């Protein structure tokens, strides 16, 4: 709502004043990055996260949030390019190098906090975007090993298996995702069980 946006902008102003007083305080920079993110000022959010990391290189959630925001920026850019180029008969795509910064941040999160499930899950999603399905499967496996109730990991791993032609494994994962509450998995199962494997 407009009231929430106004509150976040006021918070940005307050946090900016606090940062002027303590420019090397990682927590203050991180806090402001969250406000920038919530008002969708992604460039300033990324800049504050970078400054947070420069102040404290072990601030794992700053690496994670920066990866999440950069991924959102790429997805937004990709959707915009697809829309703009759809009328021209051309299709532009993002390069693997566009995803490298994201993957490096997630690698750092995993280095700092090896059991942070969402780092593996998000890195798997980035690997899928880069058409590196084997790496994606390994990261989905690790995410599920850490949290066996992560329905989205089963769902995405199932889709990846199906894409690679492993329908039986894919359907097993989709079924598990459905059991865990991701009910749209059942629609996907129905589509693929109507086909021959």
Question: Which sequence ranges carry the predicted segments?
Answer:
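Alpha-helical tetratricopeptide repeat
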Residues: 1-197
